[in-house]
Amino acid sequence: MNVAVIGAGRMGADHVRRLHESINNATVAAVVDIDLDRAKAATEGTGALAVASLAEAFAVEGVNAVLIATPGFLHEEALYQALQRDVPILCEKPMTPDAASAWRVVQAEVALGRQRIQVGFMRQFDAGYQSLKSEIEAGAAGSLLMLHCANRNASTLADFTEPMLINDSVVHEFDAIRFFTGEEITSVQVQVQVQVQVQVQVQRGKRSSLAPEGISDPQHVLIETESGILADVEIFVNARYGYEVATQAVFENGVRSIGAGEVTPSFIERFAAAYDAEVQAWVDAALHGEIGGPSAWDGYATAACCEAGVAAQRSGQRTAVVLAAKPELYR
């Protein structure tokens, strides 16, 4: 499989290296970036061509798959171009920045008549996540009742905004909760330290003195699924000590924890093996005309969760997740 990697930033360059060094049955044929110098730097030692547009990449002989790793607001148009050529697509999260654009992408894929888009929620490929998923499905400890999640990051960049706690971080918990439970999320509530009128009930958490000006950090997110499973997420993006993601599953007859104490400098180190497994699964499935992980529907559903999460963050109130009817293609 000859892959065009779109975007030569941190994630794109990492995927170029991964495809070149670690993935079987795939090669990097082209790297696309509007900054040609950055694209050329990413191609060094791979034999791939550096180009400035996806149209140029498709003109490269043999290109028959696309990996999208640009900023999220650029994903939609790239997805349409790739769908028009009916090639396998691995799109980093978010699939698109909002539910409306994500639904348009779903409709475009439905019109194509088969699934071509795999969305890059890499945690599903982590060994710990897969082990916990297997235990939930086996049911040896009874039904899953609750999930307690923590998502901690060492620090944020200067341009970080409060909605990014949801859109960039809790988005992974939205996906993980859907992955573990096999259910859609129905509501989200975010509890922060805010000034509110008495009639609005918001639990006020203590704000870290190290949080950037204007951002309440950490925050607490309460999530409910279709069958009533409750999940809570501690999101703390300026924890300073490192990157740590942990999940505790509460069953009728037992408790299982993953991730606690696995502290790394960033998500890249923590989920390096998961990224490798994700891309290999995509390649293996694509060679058989299939996808090997989260679908465009999953990308749409998590976008809807994020919209509800940001609305709940602003209001402090329980907010419903609104989803369109699930197309037959994804059932």
Swiss-Prot record:
Molecular function as annotated in GO? inositol 2-dehydrogenase (NAD+) activity; nucleotide binding
Q: What domain of life does the UniProt record list for this protein's source?
A: Bacteria
Keyword set, alphabetical order: NAD, Oxidoreductase
Q: List the disulfide bonds.
A: none
List the GO biological process terms. Answer: inositol catabolic process
Q: What does the record give as EC number?
A: 1.1.1.18
Describe the reaction catalysed, as an equation: myo-inositol + NAD(+) = scyllo-inosose + NADH + H(+)
**Per the record, a Pfam family?**
GFO_IDH_MocA
Q: Which family does it belong to?
A: Belongs to the Gfo/Idh/MocA family.
**Quaternary organization:** Homotetramer.
Function per UniProt: Involved in the oxidation of myo-inositol (MI) to 2-keto-myo-inositol (2KMI or 2-inosose).
In terms of HAMAP family, this protein maps to: IolG (MF_01671)
Name of the protein in question: Inositol 2-dehydrogenase
What is the protein's species of origin?
Renibacterium salmoninarum (strain ATCC 33209 / DSM 20767 / JCM 11484 / NBRC 15589 / NCIMB 2235)
The gene behind this protein is iolG
